[in-house]
Swiss-Prot record:
This is Pyrroline-5-carboxylate reductase. PANTHER family: PYRROLINE-5-CARBOXYLATE REDUCTASE, PYRROLINE-5-CARBOXYLATE REDUCTASE 3. It comes from Neurospora crassa (strain ATCC 24698 / 74-OR23-1A / CBS 708.71 / DSM 1257 / FGSC 987). Its EC number is 1.5.1.2. GO terms for molecular function: pyrroline-5-carboxylate reductase activity. InterPro entries: 6-PGluconate_DH-like_C_sf, NAD(P)-bd_dom_sf, P5C_Rdtase_cat_N, P5CR-like_CS, P5CR_dimer, Pyrroline-COOH_reductase. The gene is pro-1. Belongs to the pyrroline-5-carboxylate reductase family. One of its GO terms (biological process) is L-proline biosynthetic process. Pathway: Amino-acid biosynthesis; L-proline biosynthesis; L-proline from L-glutamate 5-semialdehyde: step 1/1. It catalyses: L-proline + NADP(+) = (S)-1-pyrroline-5-carboxylate + NADPH + 2 H(+); L-proline + NAD(+) = (S)-1-pyrroline-5-carboxylate + NADH + 2 H(+). The keyword Amino-acid biosynthesis applies.
Length: 332
């Protein structure tokens, strides 16, 4: 293992424990952004005073080590950032060194990972010459695992006292983080996080797209709409392309046209156009659009899509062993 890097007061270490596809995307966005900041003589004043510049990624197998190194090493600039990719046997040492720990493992693996031998000491705030090290930040992107779930594991399974608990955050990015177009939802907490932590979290997840903060009781619905929603919209896009192919369009062109049309509609909504107004603007009297829309309404597309979001919300809550409210008996 390489020797730990010496950090300045403006440099943090971030460990991704269980660095799969999402972890790679997040680190890719951060590393690329750090390189851009280094090339800009006047970086934005909105950047937090301390940024993660040293990174440790842990994975389960040697082949995964090679995969992560292949994806991320080209983005590392020696004068700007450092990266080490280790096997998961190094989870404890990675956590000990890190200021920020991102849990990228499967939800069912969280307890076992955090309760590993030595993890209690790795996560405990150390006191040296009368000065306490800052609290670590644990960010979970594990579907269905709540902040209380994580805090319970840290207290009961890891054995940390209330005074030594890290700052625990739940965030839910989506697969579009790969192209920096994620919609990430971060769980608000009570009492609120310190401003410095909020600024840091926002900066991290804005490297891969947009960020919003919402209360914990909405997180499973956010998982459904933002994470599962990618698949829902892909199905609608595929269906639209199928219709075009049925009417004679080549498959490749139909896929491209459907994707670009969906992107255009999304862009208009993000610019402030209400979806209903957008739909109305395109629906000229006696035209083809209103004819097609009536077929969609007759087929119950609106209700089916809404119910899919509700059902996925229920399943998301079950992933972490929790419950979901306001689903009105959608499961049967």
């Amino acid at each position: 293992m390489a020797a730990p890097q010496v950090k300045s007061s403006s440099e943090l270490t971030m460990a991704v424990l269980g660095c799969g596809t999402m972890g790679i995307s997040i680190l890719s966005g951060i590393l690329s952004s750090l390189s851009s900041i280094a090339q800009d003589p006047s970086p934005p004043p909105t950047n937090p005073p301390a940024l993660p510049r040293h990174f440790i990624a842990t994975v389960r197998s040697p082949s995964s080590v090679a995969k992560v190194e292949s994806a991320l090493s080209p983005l590392v600039k020696p004068s700007v950032s450092t990266l080490r990719v280790l096997q998961s046997t190094s989870n404890v040492s990675a956590a000990a060194e890190a200021d920020i720990i991102l849990l990228g493992c499967k939800p069912y693996m969280v307890s076992g990972l955090l309760s590993a031998s030595g993890m209690k000491d790795a996560l405990t705030v150390k006191h040296t010459e009368g000065h306490a090290r800052s609290q670590k930040i644990i960010i979970s992107i594990c579907a269905g695992v709540t902040v209380p779930d994580l805090e319970r594991v840290l207290r009961e399974d890891v054995g940390l006292s209330a005074d030594n608990l890290p700052i625990v955050v739940r965030a839910m990015p989506n697969t579009a983080s790969k192209i920096r177009e994620s919609m990430t939802v971060i769980n608000t907490v009570d009492p609120p996080l310190p401003d410095t932590v909020t600024e840091l979290l926002t900066w991290i997840f804005e490297r891969i797209g947009e960020v919003v903060y919402l209360p914990p009781h909405l997180m499973d619905a956010c998982t459904s709409l933002c994470a599962s929603g990618t698949a829902f919209f892909a199905l609608m896009m595929e269906a639209a392309a199928d219709g075009g192919v049925a009417m004679g369009l080549p498959r490749a062109e139909a896929n491209r046209m459907a994707a670009q049309t969906m992107r255009g509609a999304a862009g208009l909504v993000l610019e402030g156009e209400h979806p209903a107004i957008l739909r109305e603007k395109v629906s000229t009297p006696g035209g083809c659009t209103i004819g097609g829309l009536l077929v969609l309404e007759e087929g119950g597309v609106r209700a089916a899509v809404a119910r899919a979001v509700r059902e996925a919300t229920v399943v998301a809550s079950l992933l972490g062993g929790g419950g979901a409210k306001n689903v009105n008996g959608t499961r049967h």
